[in-house]
């Protein structure tokens, strides 16, 4: 009995000794694995996984209980109105939980059925416009994402829409996916009228009285009833957008070119099936709009969807090639990882060998559209050329890797949509070259007839191809060939889309059906939980932008960009002063960031050197600041220092006279002249909020303060007063007195110490242990998935998955 008691006490003391941050990371991995156990993806399985996590960890100790609350309440998946009502009552009873909610997901909400109708739901009043607004007011301190769907479109009145679009909150991701109808449209128009009170001016010259600098992601997918002038007003209010989904909306040519402001951070854009947009407007947008053409933009496009309906489109081959060339001209081809040009006609040459490649200023020139994409889009991982009839031989040439003489053009394509291709049919789908020509390809999307042919081959619904070591040889040696297995993905929830994927033991398993339908128990009768994820290739097949960060963020980079966390919390459990944290309350961004500034030259001065001070009375005074420089240049001082008789006893540090720095306090008056009054009003409001709530100064305010920048400009860039007195033998910046040994040691140091997150972009260079290749492969896959998460996100459950993967 004493032994049992001592063991219990030792385990409790051990649990208390572990820092909560470490426990948080461990439980985060468990929480992520359980919620990704989503094959097949049903609401019952989600609730079962959540219940398993709560029962396993909630009652261990106080630390586990607090961490479970942080993880569970962060992402609120509201599937029924009754669940929403229960959550609202819980928040009213415990206000500390309000700060833990970051995501409100209504995309799977439905309560119609089981004997209920929409009229009965209105009478129950579990979820109405009043209760929804009350929920938003309670969670405004830390709510980052609001994901709606068509099932709550009638509950989104003008007060809710005005509240969502108004500045002063940390809400960064807004998705109205599928919302339409007369009630929703009238509410949207009424809410926007409050931001555009002056109706006497032409609607295309109107400016909002307030702008929201916090919202970075906006989804209007399938909002078909919103008029074009309403879209104009919405886009004018959001100058800091990074992700914009306008798929299947009523946007027209004028709104596309004149209504979109100059977004410098845009990375994701979807203009799919916008029937009122002409090819000319799209080409003018990609040719002249500063969002695409400005070389000073912070980001370039990484995700682009311009697919159209082929039989009702006026696009031709010249338009498509012109669009691709404009993407290359403005540098987007170097960062694009997703490109959907389904329905756009492509020019197909008889053979790549008959279409010579010539290098020009911005791109490799050729006539064939596929060859142009192959040579000029090296980072592309997902490509859709749906509706184009391309021969199998041309597809094989396109997927075949480029020679090693051009390493910068190496292809990384993983997903290819060739549905609607008349050459890929039930007679040609079994061509083995289509499955073995590309080492990086993991999935193909084909038409139903082709997919059904593979499904009927055997009971396992798979096809096995062989990759030979000498594919060009007449005699094939199957004993040395590599076996490649491709399988049909069967899931009835995705409508009319059919995929073939290459199986592997980690990301795209071939035993999904057998494992998901099998329940196992141990010898004591406890259920064995086996994590079965959806295939990883589905994230490349999505046609809708994933706006948020998902159930559990896999990388801090995406969260930092989407949420604009300028001052992230030091800990989930302790604040910056060391006290117990009940939830992070970040400050919203209500003012634009300062312009980029300009280069200046600052002259070094040595306060401790009296000779230099005396000599300045005999020589011409050198101005403290020069005018802005067009490019960074340093002035040489070798000749002047040797010719100056007063500089005989000057220390080596004082010989460094000129320094170059980037002055962020220089304002672009022309850019800010129209916004000066508005910024001052927003700054006054922010000061009032800070005074009332006693908030601390944010890092953004501290680093972008012009007074701070001017004080910094008076500091010595190359030497401080302490270093001058203690170090008299500073090496020369020109390299005249530096030794080769120090240079070699510095180069060796740089070679051994990689920059932060280096292996996320170069996973193939990572080696965990030369004797353990399996663990090395797992690490490489992890780095690759985290890097892809920044652009593609992850395939979640619910209505988002339906809209993202539907036909």
UniProtKB/Swiss-Prot annotation:
Feature: compositional bias, Basic and acidic residues: 607-616
Polar residues compositional bias, start-end: 627-644, 723-736
Official protein name in the record: F-box protein YLR352W
Gene Ontology annotations for the cellular component aspect, listed alphabetically: SCF ubiquitin ligase complex
GO biological process: protein ubiquitination; SCF-dependent proteasomal ubiquitin-dependent protein catabolic process; ubiquitin-dependent protein catabolic process
Gene3D superfamilies for the chain: Ribonuclease Inhibitor
Additional remarks: Present with 125 molecules/cell in log phase SD medium.
Keyword field: Ubl conjugation pathway
Pathway membership: Protein modification; protein ubiquitination
Disulfide bonds: none
Function per UniProt: Substrate recognition component of a SCF (SKP1-CUL1-F-box protein) E3 ubiquitin-protein ligase complex which mediates the ubiquitination and subsequent proteasomal degradation of target proteins. Probably recognizes and binds to phosphorylated target proteins.
Disordered, as annotated region: 607-647, 716-739
Domain F-box intervals: 220-266
InterPro entries: LRR_dom_sf
Quaternary structure note: Interacts with SKP1 and CDC53. Component of the probable SCF(YBR352W) complex containing CDC53, SKP1, RBX1 and YBR352W.
């Amino acid at each position: 009995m004493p032994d049992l008691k001592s063991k219990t006490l030792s385990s409790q003391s051990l649990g208390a000794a572990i820092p909560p941050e470490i426990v948080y990371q461990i439980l985060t991995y468990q929480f992520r694995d359980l919620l990704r156990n989503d094959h097949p993806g049903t609401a019952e399985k989600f609730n079962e996984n959540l219940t398993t996590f709560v029962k396993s960890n909630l009652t261990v100790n106080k630390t586990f209980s607090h961490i479970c609350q942080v993880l569970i309440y962060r992402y609120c998946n509201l599937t029924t109105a009754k669940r929403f009502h229960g959550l609202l009552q819980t928040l009213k009873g415990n206000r500390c939980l309000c700060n833990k909610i970051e995501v409100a997901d209504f995309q799977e909400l439905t309560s119609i059925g089981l004997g209920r109708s929409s009229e009965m739901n209105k009478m129950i009043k579990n979820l109405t416009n009043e209760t929804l607004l009350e929920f938003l007011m309670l969670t405004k301190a830390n709510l980052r994402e609001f994901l709606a769907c068509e099932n709550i479109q009638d509950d989104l009145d003008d007060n809710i829409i005005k509240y969502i679009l108004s500045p002063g909150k940390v809400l960064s991701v807004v998705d109205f996916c599928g919302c339409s109808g007369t009630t929703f449209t009238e509410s949207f128009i009424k809410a926007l009228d409050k931001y555009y009170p002056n109706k006497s001016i032409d609607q295309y010259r109107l400016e909002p009285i307030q702008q929201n600098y916090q919202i970075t992601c906006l989804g209007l997918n399938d909002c078909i009833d919103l008029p074009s002038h309403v879209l104009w007003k919405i886009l004018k209010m959001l100058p800091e957008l990074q992700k914009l989904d306008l798929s299947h909306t009523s946007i027209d040519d004028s709104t596309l070119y004149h209504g979109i402001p100059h977004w410098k951070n845009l990375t994701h854009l979807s203009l799919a099936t916008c029937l009122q947009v002409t090819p000319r407007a799209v080409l003018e947008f990609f040719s002249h709009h500063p969002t695409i053409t400005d070389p000073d933009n912070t980001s370039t496009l990484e995700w682009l969807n311009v697919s159209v309906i082929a039989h009702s489109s006026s696009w031709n081959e010249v338009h498509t090639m012109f669009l691709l060339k404009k993407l290359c001209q403005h540098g987007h081809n170097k960062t694009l990882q997703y490109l959907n040009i389904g329905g756009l006609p492509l020019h197909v040459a008889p053979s790549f060998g008959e279409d010579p490649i010539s290098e020009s200023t911005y791109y490799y020139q050729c006539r064939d559209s596929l060859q142009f994409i192959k040579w000029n889009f090296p980072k592309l991982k997902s490509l859709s050329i749906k509706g184009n009839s391309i021969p199998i031989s041309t597809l094989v040439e396109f997927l075949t890797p480029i020679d090693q003489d051009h390493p910068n053009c190496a292809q990384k394509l993983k997903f290819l949509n060739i549905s609607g291709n008349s050459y890929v049919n039930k007679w040609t789908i079994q061509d083995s070259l289509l499955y073995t020509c590309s080492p990086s390809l993991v999935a193909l999307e084909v038409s139903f007839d082709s997919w059904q042919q593979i499904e009927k081959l055997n009971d396992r619904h798979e096809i096995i191809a062989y990759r030979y070591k000498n594919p060009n040889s007449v005699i094939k040696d199957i004993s040395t060939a590599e076996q490649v297995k491709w399988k049909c993905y069967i899931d009835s929830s995705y409508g009319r889309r059919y995929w073939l994927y290459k199986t592997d033991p980690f990301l795209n398993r071939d035993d999904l059906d057998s494992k998901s339908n099998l329940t196992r128990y141990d010898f004591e009768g406890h259920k064995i939980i086996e994590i079965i994820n959806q295939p990883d290739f589905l994230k490349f097949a999505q046609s809708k932008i994933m706006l948020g960060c998902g159930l559990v963020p896999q990388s801090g980079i995406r969260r930092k960009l989407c949420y604009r966390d300028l001052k992230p919390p030091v800990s989930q459990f302790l604040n910056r002063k060391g006290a117990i944290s009940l939830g992070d309350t970040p400050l919203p961004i209500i003012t634009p960031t300062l312009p980029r500034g300009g280069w200046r030259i600052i002259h070094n001065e040595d306060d401790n050197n009296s000779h230099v001070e005396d000599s300045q009375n005999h020589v011409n005074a050198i101005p403290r600041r020069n005018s802005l420089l067009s490019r960074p240049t340093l002035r040489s001082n070798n000749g002047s220092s040797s010719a100056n008789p007063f500089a005989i006893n000057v220390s080596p540090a004082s010989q460094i006279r000129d320094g170059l720095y980037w002055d962020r306090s220089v304002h672009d008056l022309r850019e800010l002249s129209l916004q000066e009054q508005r910024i001052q009003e927003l700054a006054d409001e922010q000061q009032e909020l800070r005074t009332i709530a006693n908030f601390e100064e944010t890092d953004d305010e501290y680093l972008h303060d012009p007074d701070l920048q001017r004080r910094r400009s008076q500091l010595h860039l190359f030497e401080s007063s302490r270093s001058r007195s203690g170090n008299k033998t500073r090496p020369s910046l020109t390299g005249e007195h530096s030794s080769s040994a120090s240079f070699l040691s510095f180069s060796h140091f740089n070679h051994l110490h990689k920059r932060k997150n280096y292996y996320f972009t170069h996973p193939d260079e990572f080696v965990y242990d030369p004797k353990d290749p399996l663990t090395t492969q797992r690490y490489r896959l992890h780095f690759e998935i985290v890097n892809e998460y920044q652009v593609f996100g992850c395939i979640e459950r619910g209505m988002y998955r339906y809209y993202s993967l539907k036909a």
